[in-house]
Design a protein with these regions (language model features):
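Stable alpha-helical elements in mature extracytoplasmic
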Residues: 1-4, 27, 118, 122
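Extracellular/periplasmic catalytic domains that process cell-envelope and extracellular macromolecules
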Residues: 13-14, 38-40, 79-84, 135
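Conserved alpha/beta-hydrolase "nucleophile elbow" surrounding the catalytic nucleophile
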Residues: 23-25
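The feature captures the conserved acid-bearing segment of alpha/beta-hydrolase catalytic domains
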Residues: 43-131
Length: 167
């Protein structure tokens, strides 16, 4: 990712060009994991309606948390950086259906029964951990009313500006 950004900045002749990373569903899942492990200069990372989340805990195995990872990928410093990342969980309040492609493994169901529940639970868990440890918390949670698992509707909703820019 950093080389791609460098290339675009070089091609545009704008070495300080700001950028934002936005993904829906599996794209959101990818960006949550990117926020956890890859330092970025992104102004904001927006994960819209991911099917599962990466809870900032070693009590849940990787894929759903940081458990069973080597210490260099799961230390308190890694968790602290993850919680400080400019991550927005952008959730449609209508994304409550349990579809065949939604991860229904026991580890996923521990996060919540659907995408909305999982996003809310992960945000609350992360916010409480940051508060308890006195760590910077760079995450935001933005909900858009009534929208289900639909990228076009999510990104056309007025709340998308708040998800990306905080407005």
């Amino acid at each position: 990712m950093p080389r791609l950004v460098e290339r675009i900045r070089a091609d545009e002749g704008r070495p300080a060009l700001p950028y934002y990373l936005i993904g829906h569903s599996a794209g959101g899942q990818f960006l949550v994991r990117l926020a956890a492990f890859l330092p970025t200069e992104a102004g904001r990372i927006v994960a819209a309606n991911p099917g599962s989340h990466l809870f900032p805990t070693r009590e849940r195995d990787f894929g759903y948390g940081f458990g069973a990872l080597p210490v260099e990928l799961s230390s308190d410093e890694v968790l602290r950086r993850y919680l400080a990342a400019p991550l927005t969980l952008y959730l449609g309040t209508g994304d409550t259906l349990v579809e065949a492609n939604l991860d229904q493994s026991p580890a996923a169901m521990l996060q919540g029964g659907n995408r909305l529940e999982r996003g809310r639970a992960c945000f609350a868990f992360a916010a409480e951990l940051a508060r308890a440890r006195g760590w910077t918390f760079g995450w935001r949670k933005v909900e858009t009313p009534g929208i289900g698992h639909d990228a076009a509707e999510m990104f056309a909703a007025p709340e998308v500006a708040a998800a990306i820019f905080g407005r």
